[in-house]
Amino acid sequence: MIGRLRGLLVEKQAPEVLIETGGVGYEVQMPLTSFYELPELNQEAVIYTHFVVREDAQLLYGFITKQERALFRLLIKTNGVGPKLALTILSGMTAGEFVKCVEHDDIATLVKLPGVGKKTAERLLVEMRDKLKSLMEASHGNEREFVLQSNYTPAPVVNTAEEDAISALLALGYKPAQASKAVSSVFEEGMDSETLIKASLKSML
């Protein structure tokens, strides 16, 4: 199993990255909360990974912290939640925000995420409550460990910011009409693609 990668960040297009180590390039899918914590291209990156083997593919999912990876692993053990939906959940909200949703039985926020209907949200609240309690105890009850503090610095603005943002939202499972509407509603002149993606996601929660 591949549990950790340290290498050169060669490609970076939300929600996927390519990290080269030992002459091998690893394609990794990441939740946007972790994606925003990555360094600039051609710099060294260190991520914790979860390796999934399917009949038709072998996939790597990456995270900046062990805590977020631990939450991802708990999510995919929930009935009806696979890696893709777990990634979408952790892209739409931070790990800390998800913990608060479970603590407060906040179905209304969860159902705003693509792929999460009322039944799935209810199942998440029920099944994750005890699992999160164990996870928090393992972290000494410190919820701050689940909240990523971003040191993100906007990249130079490019003309394709809106296109990049829409593509990222589509990759997360949003419908074309939803993605276009969300991006258009928050777009301001001078926004780079990553800032636009974050603002678009926030507008839909």
From Swiss-Prot:
Record's subcellular location: Cytoplasm
Span list, region Domain II: 65-143
Pfam families: HHH_5 (PF14520), RuvA_C (PF07499), RuvA_N (PF01330)
Region Flexible linker: start-end pairs: 144-156
Record region (Domain III): 157-205
One GO biological process term: DNA repair
One GO CC annotation: Holliday junction resolvase complex
Record NCBIfam families: ruvA
Subunit structure: Homotetramer. Forms an RuvA(8)-RuvB(12)-Holliday junction (HJ) complex. HJ DNA is sandwiched between 2 RuvA tetramers; dsDNA enters through RuvA and exits via RuvB. An RuvB hexamer assembles on each DNA strand where it exits the tetramer. Each RuvB hexamer is contacted by two RuvA subunits (via domain III) on 2 adjacent RuvB subunits; this complex drives branch migration. In the full resolvosome a probable DNA-RuvA(4)-RuvB(12)-RuvC(2) complex forms which resolves the HJ.
Name used for this protein in its record: Holliday junction branch migration complex subunit RuvA
